[in-house]
């Protein structure tokens, strides 16, 4: 099976609906055999990883972790859908404030753990 690259792709927010769909799409598009799934919510992340393992995608090296350093170290491509979910009673402004802090921390982590990253996409 041919892939576009052998470089590591990390999906941030992989336990969520968008992130888990991005992971499956990346696999089906044969982007890379080296896929790392990251989410701070470990139980949900494990469930997503197990679903992908059960699909039996050939030639894939799928790893998952709730450790941001492990997830980003060596990554050449990063796609992030990670952010706070909107809760009852929250305004868009409240959500923006929370997500701004998350985005700031994400940027610092990318700089620290994968300074040679080629592309970062934030959804």
Can you say where each PLM-predicted feature lies in the sequence?
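Rossmann-like NAD(P)(H) cofactor-binding subdomain of soluble oxidoreductases
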Residues: 91-123
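Conserved N-terminal Rossmann-fold NAD(P) cofactor-binding segment
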Residues: 6, 31-76, 84, 90
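Conserved glycine-rich cofactor-binding loop
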Residues: 15
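N-terminal Rossmann-fold NAD(P) dinucleotide-binding loop
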Residues: 19-20
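Generic hydrophobic/aromatic pocket-lining and core-packing "Φ" positions
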Residues: 23-24, 107
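A short, Lys/Arg-enriched amphipathic alpha-helix followed by its capping loop at the start of a domain
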Residues: 25-31
């Amino acid at each position: 099976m041919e892939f576009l690259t052998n470089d590591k792709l990390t999906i941030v927010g992989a336990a969520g609906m968008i992130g888990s769909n991005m992971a499956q799409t990346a696999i089906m598009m044969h982007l890379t055999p080296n896929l790392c799934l990251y989410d701070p919510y470990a139980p949900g992340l494990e469930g997503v990883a197990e679903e992908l393992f059960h699909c039996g995608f050939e030639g894939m090296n799928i790893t998952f972790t709730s450790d941001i350093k492990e997830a980003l170290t060596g990554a050449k491509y990063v796609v992030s859908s990670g952010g706070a979910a909107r809760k009852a009673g929250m305004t868009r402004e409240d959500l923006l404030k929370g997500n701004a802090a998350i985005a700031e921390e994400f940027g610092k982590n990318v700089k620290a753990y994968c300074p040679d990253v080629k592309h970062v996409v934030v959804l």
